[in-house]
């Protein structure tokens, strides 16, 4: 963790996969890595995957799709929270491939998910597309698994 907080993975264009149950602290840890990257003068963008997919769909309808895509392709560190909570449509999978391909070995991405990469293939859908996306993510990433009995919200929430 200490080594990752120095942002060498961003400098080397590697990714992080942060896995754990709901409330395990994946978002907290992702944001902490994002803050560390900002402090090291990297550009950072945080977005939940459902919000990203919605933004791309709206941008496509408004004729500004390429402009919006450029924002996600150029940032030094992109944090994708709630990665693959629900299955993707073919259009969404193609959009993600475009982002992942553009960033592969050129920029870093943090993928925060409740599901292990073995389950991602089924969520992406179409086999060839899923293979292309996962190949670019999994083989160039550090993986952090957060294990714990209780939800962070349960431990840190308001006590009666």
Predicted regions: what they are:
Residues 77:
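Short, Asp-centered acidic motifs that coordinate Mg2+ and/or phosphate
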Residues 1-74, 121:
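Conserved P-loop
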């Amino acid at each position: 963790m200490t080594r990752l907080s120095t942002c060498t993975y961003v400098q080397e264009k590697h990714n992080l996969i942060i896995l754990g149950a709901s409330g395990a602290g994946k978002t907290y840890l992702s944001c902490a890595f994002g803050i560390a990257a900002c402090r090291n003068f990297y550009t950072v963008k945080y977005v939940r995957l459902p919000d990203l997919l919605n933004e791309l769909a709206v941008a496509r309808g408004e004729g500004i799709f390429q402009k919006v895509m450029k924002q996600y392709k150029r940032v030094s560190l992109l944090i994708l929270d709630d990665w693959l909570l629900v299955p993707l449509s073919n259009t969404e999978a193609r959009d993600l491939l475009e982002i992942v391909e553009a960033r592969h070995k050129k920029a870093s991405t943090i993928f925060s998910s409740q599901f292990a990469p073995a389950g991602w293939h089924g969520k992406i859908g179409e086999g060839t597309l899923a293979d292309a996306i996962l190949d670019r993510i999994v083989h160039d990433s550090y993986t952090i698994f957060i294990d714990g009995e209780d939800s962070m919200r349960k431990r840190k929430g308001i006590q009666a």
